[in-house]
Structure formats: structure tokens, C-alpha cells
């Protein structure tokens, strides 16, 4: 009853949140306690509480790890042509990333990672060495991207999420599919590089 009519899990903190030092776990969007709908505004244990009626409208369309939930203080509309151009640039960047991985061109692949990239406590140089030893040693036959979702960060201008299903097929035929999240940063020159990433 405390969580109302329904609840949906969030991926907070995601890789970018952790990069910024944000902490927490078990964060949900949930309804309000029907027995006492007058809880203090911020009494949600770090979760987001919405009226039950609003959440029930979303219940049939919400899929965990599929439906994007964007939380921001305000909404800004931008020109559709600017959105289309940015989408095209991001799609090309993701395609270059996949092609370099498939071709085994580790230097082109690693060049798509930002100098300020961090992963598993490693800086870019440490992570590059690790990747050359692990990813670079794989005998990859094909890399396939599907279900690509592109989102702009609601707060930080020039930061984008590319979430997709990544299928890597080895030369022997074995295939592994994961859900990959890459966070791309656009530089002043317009170049896109990966600043953070995570599976799941």
C-alpha cells in the first residue's frame, strides 16, 4: 500500500549519474499510498511518487529497461530539423563504433572514446590497454545493432544516450547479445565521443 497502485523501477544511478558521483539504489516511480494521500511532498525515500491515476494510465505501456523515463525540471522544444540532424549524427557515430569493432580496428574503435572516459575505476589509458587485451583478442565475425534508442540529456547540453541491443557473433558462430548504453558527448567542434557506458 505504501507504494500505491503500481511501481516501475528506474536505472538510477545510471553510468552517467555514477560518473557525477550520484549514489543510491532501488529508485522507483510509484503511486501514492491510498490510505494516506497526504504524505509530505519529499517523503518518498528517494523515489518519485505520482498520483495513482496517472501511473495506471502508463501501466500497460511501461516496460522495464525499455521504456525511457526522462526526469527534468523543464521542457524545451527545439526545431525538428535540428533533432533530425543530431539523430543522424548519432546514428552514424554508433554505426562507426560497431563497424570498427566488427573489423577489429581497435584504434578506430578506441578513438571514439572521450579522453575523459572512465569505466570500472579505470581512466581512458588504463581502459584502452584492458580493451586491447580483452576485446581486441576476440575473433569477431559480425556486430549487429538493433532497437536503437537515442535521447538527449534533459540537463546537460551536448550529452546523449544511445541505448541498443548489441549482438556480437564470433567466427565459430557463438553469439552474445547484451543491452548496451553509451553516453556520447558532443564537443564544440561537433565531434561525438563516448564519455561513459554500461551494459544492461
What is each stretch, according to the model?
Residues 174-200:
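Short beta-strand edge/turn micro-motifs at domain boundaries
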Residues 1-95:
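Exported/periplasmic cell-wall-interacting domains
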Residues 103-116, 120:
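Short, well-ordered alpha-helical segments enriched in acidic and aromatic residues
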Amino acid at each position: 500500500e505504501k507504494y500505491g497502485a503500481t511501481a516501475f523501477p528506474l536505472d538510477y544511478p545510471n553510468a552517467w549519474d555514477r560518473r557525477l558521483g550520484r549514489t543510491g539504489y532501488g529508485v522507483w516511480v510509484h503511486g501514492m499510498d491510498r490510505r494516506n494521500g497526504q504524505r509530505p511532498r519529499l517523503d518518498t525515500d528517494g523515489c518519485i511518487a505520482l498520483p495513482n491515476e496517472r501511473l495506471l494510465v502508463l501501466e500497460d505501456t511501461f516496460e522495464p529497461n525499455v521504456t525511457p523515463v526522462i526526469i527534468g525540471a523543464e521542457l524545451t522544444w527545439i526545431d525538428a530539423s535540428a533533432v533530425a540532424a543530431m539523430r543522424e549524427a548519432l546514428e552514424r557515430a554508433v554505426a562507426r563504433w560497431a563497424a570498427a569493432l566488427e573489423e577489429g580496428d581497435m584504434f578506430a574503435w578506441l578513438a571514439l572514446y572521450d579522453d575523459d572516459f572512465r569505466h570500472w575505476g579505470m581512466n581512458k589509458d588504463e581502459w584502452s590497454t584492458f580493451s586491447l587485451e580483452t576485446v581486441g583478442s576476440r575473433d569477431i565475425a559480425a556486430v549487429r545493432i538493433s532497437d536503437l534508442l537515442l535521447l538527449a540529456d534533459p540537463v546537460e547540453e551536448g550529452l546523449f544516450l544511445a541505448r541498443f541491443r548489441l549482438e556480437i557473433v564470433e567466427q565459430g558462430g557463438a553469439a552474445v547479445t547484451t543491452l548496451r548504453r553509451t553516453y556520447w558527448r558532443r564537443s564544440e567542434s561537433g565531434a561525438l565521443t563516448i564519455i561513459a557506458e554500461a551494459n544492461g
